[in-house]
Amino acid sequence: FKTKSLVTKIYTGPSAKPHPGQGSSFFNEGLGQQLGATVNMNLGQVTIWDDNFDVIRQIPTGGGGLFIGTSEHTPFLWADNVLGGPANWNSVHLINKQTLELDRIITVGTTQGTVKDPVTHKTLYKWKVPTVKDAKGKAITPRILHAEPANHGHWTMISEWNCGRIGIYEAKTGKFVKYITGLTTPTFTYSIEHRQTIPG
């Protein structure tokens, strides 16, 4: 920050377009290192790098994403697939920060939401989703993005871009808690503490 000079570049792949916005940083106990992570806008892929800025893992997801989020209160990286097309943009992939493997997938349908194990395909949790319809009366597939941890650590909040609501989920499990409705194109941040800065 003092010299405002380039420190390094992280190569995420020959055709990858990492999103320049919010990434994630977390400590991996097995490696004993602080790791970094980003989604890629045009690929279903989360890129993980170590504290030497070397890429150590490419984790497949459902499609291109914009945001990946975490905090010390959740065991997961929460990666959206909002640019992955209609078949994928209603899911968020939860990656275990210690194993660096996909742990569960949140999917929000037009009438039901699920949290599933990606290996066994077992449904871990499910809930009823209020159907939102367009001007022609057709049910809208929720386009979900930007998992944001609440400051108190109990919840993670996920925007539903085209449905005017935010989904609240348990940070430790991904289990659905409730909706906040009546919003217009919710996209970004909800935790004031995460965006405050101290002048000086």
Language-model segment annotations:
Residues 1-200:
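Predominantly soluble domains enriched in secretory-pathway, periplasmic, or organellar proteins
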